[in-house]
Amino acid sequence: MRATQHSTLNSQLSSSLFLTGTDTGVGKTHVAQLLVRRFRREGLDCVGMKPICCGGREDAELLHAASEAAIPLNDVNPVWLRPPAAPYTAAIIENRPIDLALIRETFTRLRAAHPSLIVEGVGGWRVPIARDFFVSDLAAECGLPVVVVVANRLGAINHTLLTVESIRAHGLVCAGIILNHTTAAGEIPDIAETTNRSVLEDLLDVPILFEIAHGQMAVALSPLECGGRA
């Protein structure tokens, strides 16, 4: 079934979302900060949250800046592990368990204080946070509509189908897909990049909300048609 098209970003998206990806490094943080900035420009008190950072803290700093420092950096990112690995692995290396209670308390407080909250997961949908707790479980606890960021490249179809299937298996709503282009302006996209959208629309009953061009620094404020890039 083809995805239903909508005319504006607000009609497509709740202003509070859980953002996941088909993998690590697909552009979740870039998309998250674009959404936070977009909603704030529309007058919403929107802030970003990345509950867990592993390695550097640059992702949290970008969300903090997008939120115009409306909340402390430690609320944007309550748990920071230095090893650049999956949270479960990083916690073992640091010999300190991840403080899930702190994440839950911070999320609950931000959700109550701000009408718009963009939560960015860490890595992909099934990345382990603890031995028996995954990103998917964190999303389920947050209870927000889930949007999947997809790097538009070879392999995207399989990764997207598996991710959407798992989201639904966890009883959550997949609110849509955002295609993030990896080919820079002036480069010739390959056949996968030029066909992934139409194939995903044919195979999934999930809307492709919009596409992000490589290096794009804003989501248009004008009405956004799903038929082309944002």
Name each region found by the language model.
Residues 4-13:
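Arg/Gly-rich low-complexity intrinsically disordered repeat tracts
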Residues 16, 30-97, 101, 106-109:
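N-terminal phosphate/diphosphate-binding loop that engages ATP/GTP or pyrophosphate donors
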Residues 19-20:
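Hydrophobic anchor at the beta1->P-loop junction of P-loop NTPases
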Residues 25, 34-35, 54, 122-211:
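Conserved catalytic-core segment of NTP-binding enzymes
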Residues 81-82, 209, 214-220:
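A short acidic, often aromatic-flanked loop/helix-cap motif at beta-alpha or helix-coil junctions
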Residues 103, 107-130:
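Switch II (G3) loop of P-loop NTPases
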